[in-house]
């Protein structure tokens, strides 16, 4: 008797899917190979990891215009992660940005295994979530904070859910560490995390002490850097150089950060339709409602960012905040609502809607994935050094400075 086994890709569908995402990521990154990545937002990487360590311990910053401020909190993380790549730290940012989609899909699939037993829907959900990194425009814009936040968000949700269900100290510490890491790159994640922990403590009273410890750890690790931003009302939205990031309400509702490299808002329409329909089945409505609350919270953050302006430096012109992280959380919540309600399509009452639902479900990853591979992740991201001009200089008109005098009378 000869037993023919199915092909490897059919026996291991998720591994095959991840392999395909890695290949697609390399194809999409074809235009940014060869040099450290830079953009208006993403500063050029240091020539050596030792320069990141210098930022942590030197008394004043001797780069650019010079500064007496302490280094951003994310420099601590980059310094540690860059040790294995000591003489090529630019490779670290390259890996984080180019491979962000498969990385986010992997963490999403891990969380999906906790909340869904439907393999097909879970895989589609994980791939769709991973594509949020490019749909929002975070990858092509060099918004490293949003990329890190979207990659770690499913891991945070996974451990937080386990903490609420089984209150123990190891996951409480892990949650605090994740809050610190994500907030270091995307400071707006800190108030979101505090609100989330407070709501979880209200709902799950037995885990209140562990959740409080998570909040303390996440806040303490950020240290004075966080409180400096609270007291001086400085940049809250994204790591890197503060640049103008205009986004309309329609763009935020479509999951876009409003930058050049963001996808069209129409790609998200099938997802929104499915998320609204997910509210209909009563047996899954409670879980779907929780996902909708998360989604609406992200939408509020995105809309708030789209109308918020700030001066990055004293005397600098106002710039609009980056709304990509809130837009990404908005779509992530909608996707999760669909995943929660998906088992109802196997029941007799909703079985006739299975084919239309599947068609709508696969539209988002097909369109977003195809757009990602064809367009690539360059523009404005590039592999050549960008000449960065301070915002207060770029906003001013060109002037001419005339120097007269000699070595005796002096320069006037």
Q: Which residues does each PLM region occupy?
A:
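Periplasmic/ER-lumenal interhelical loops and adjacent helix-loop junctions
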Residues: 1, 54-61, 214-287, 384
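Active-site lumenal/periplasmic loops and adjacent helix-entry segments of GT-C-fold
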Residues: 29-155, 159-163, 169
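Short hydrophobic alpha-helices at membrane interfaces in multi-pass membrane enzymes
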Residues: 163-181, 208-212
């Amino acid at each position: 008797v000869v037993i023919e086994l199915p092909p490897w890709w059919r026996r291991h569908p998720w591994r095959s899917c991840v392999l395909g995402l890695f290949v697609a990521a390399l194809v999409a990154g074809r235009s940014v190979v060869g040099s450290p990545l830079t953009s208006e937002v993403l500063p050029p990487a240091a020539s050596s990891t030792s320069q990141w360590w210098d930022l942590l311990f030197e008394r004043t910053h001797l780069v650019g215009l010079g500064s007496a401020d302490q280094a951003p909190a994310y420099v601590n993380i980059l310094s540690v992660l860059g040790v294995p790549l000591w003489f090529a730290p630019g490779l670290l940012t390259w890996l984080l940005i180019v491979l962000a989609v498969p990385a986010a899909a992997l963490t999403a699939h891990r969380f999906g295994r906790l909340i869904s037993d439907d393999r097909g829907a879970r895989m589609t959900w994980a791939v769709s979530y991973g594509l949020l990194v490019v749909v929002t425009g975070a990858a092509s814009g060099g918004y490293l904070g949003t990329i890190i936040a979207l990659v770690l968000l499913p891991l945070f949700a996974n451990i937080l859910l386990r903490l609420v269900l089984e209150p123990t100290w190891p996951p409480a510490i892990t949650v605090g560490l994740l809050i610190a890491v994500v907030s270091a790159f995307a400071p707006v994640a800190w108030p979101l995390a505090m609100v989330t922990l407070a709501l979880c403590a209200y709902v799950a009273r037995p885990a209140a002490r562990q959740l409080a410890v998570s909040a303390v750890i996440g806040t303490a690790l950020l240290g004075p850097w966080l409180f400096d931003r609270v007291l001086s009302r400085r940049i809250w939205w994204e790591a890197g150089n503060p640049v103008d990031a205009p986004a309309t309400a329609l763009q935020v509702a479509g999951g876009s950060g409003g930058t050049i490299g963001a996808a069209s808002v129409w790609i998200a329409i099938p997802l929104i339709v499915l998320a609204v329909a997910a509210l209909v089945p009563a047996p899954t409505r409670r879980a779907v409602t929780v996902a909708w609350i998360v989604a609406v919270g992200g939408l509020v953050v995105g809309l708030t960012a789209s109308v918020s302006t700030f001066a990055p430096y004293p005397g600098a012109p106002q710039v609009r905040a980056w709304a990509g992280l809130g837009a990404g959380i908005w779509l992530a919540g909608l996707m999760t609502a669909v995943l929660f309600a998906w088992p109802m399509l196997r029941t007799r009452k909703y079985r006739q809607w299975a084919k239309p639902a599947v068609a709508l479900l696969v539209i988002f990853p097909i369109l977003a994935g195809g757009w990602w591979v064809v367009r690539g992740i360059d523009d404005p991201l590039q592999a050549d050094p960008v000449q960065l001009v301070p915002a207060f200089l770029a906003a001013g008109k060109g002037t001419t400075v005339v120097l007269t005098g000699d070595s005796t009378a002096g320069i006037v």
